[in-house]
């Protein structure tokens, strides 16, 4: 392979490091922050040079789709298969949860974190501390399987009357539903009807 410049080597080594530790490559923004480049176009330029020199392969149709080209120096890298899962922003009543207008971005998720059909999976960014006693923290990403039913004790994503998604523990009581926070300082939400849009099946947290 052709020789790399100092900056290209920094970027290449950073990509390898992230792949080794996380199982998937970093974003362009993360690469720039790691090597001190503020311009994403400059990072893209270096990635193009790395691709031309045969060190990486990229898929322009997918975010973060950077593949380390195997050679004698990196045969020991185990790059885990990833799926690109929609990250849902605003949830609109009457619109399927994964409708285009609800999707903010796609996130590369290690395949082992899902256990069902990929098309049924979406991600919500957690805001707030209502579920901290279940180990779900502000800023976490919850991995959700689309479904409209739930069993008592399930952690679900439900639609509020304000058309916002909320993550709570689900309970069906005699004449009402209870959405229970996992935070002893917060009160439960009682509803006559509840719109379940998914069950939390996993959690992803940036270290």
Swiss-Prot record:
Transmembrane segments: none
Coiled-coil residue windows: none
Gene3D superfamilies given in the database record: Umud Fragment, subunit A, Winged helix-like DNA-binding domain superfamily/Winged helix DNA-binding domain
Enzymatic class: hydrolase
Keyword DNA repair: yes
GO terms classed as biological process: DNA repair; DNA replication; negative regulation of DNA-templated transcription; proteolysis; SOS response
Sorted UniProt keywords: Autocatalytic cleavage, DNA damage, DNA repair, DNA replication, DNA-binding, Hydrolase, Repressor, SOS response, Transcription, Transcription regulation
DNA bind region: 28-48
Gene Ontology CC entries for this record: protein-DNA complex
Alphabetical list of InterPro entries matching this protein: ArsR-like_HTH, LexA, LexA-like, LexA/Signal_pep-like_sf, LexA_DNA-bd_dom, LexA_repressor, Peptidase_S24_LexA, Peptidase_S24_S26A/B/C
Active-site residues (renumbered): 130, 168
EC number(s) from the headed UniProt entry: 3.4.21.88
Site keyed Cleavage: positions: 93-94
GO molecular function annotation: DNA-binding transcription repressor activity; sequence-specific DNA binding; serine-type endopeptidase activity
Keyword Lipid biosynthesis: no
Catalyses which reaction(s): Hydrolysis of Ala-|-Gly bond in repressor LexA
Described function: Represses a number of genes involved in the response to DNA damage (SOS response), including recA and lexA. In the presence of single-stranded DNA, RecA interacts with LexA causing an autocatalytic cleavage which disrupts the DNA-binding part of LexA, leading to derepression of the SOS regulon and eventually DNA repair.
Family, per entry: Belongs to the peptidase S24 family.
Quaternary state and interactors: Homodimer.
Protein name: LexA repressor
Organism encoding this protein: Staphylococcus aureus (strain NCTC 8325 / PS 47)
Lineage of the organism: Bacteria, Bacillati, Bacillota, Bacilli, Bacillales
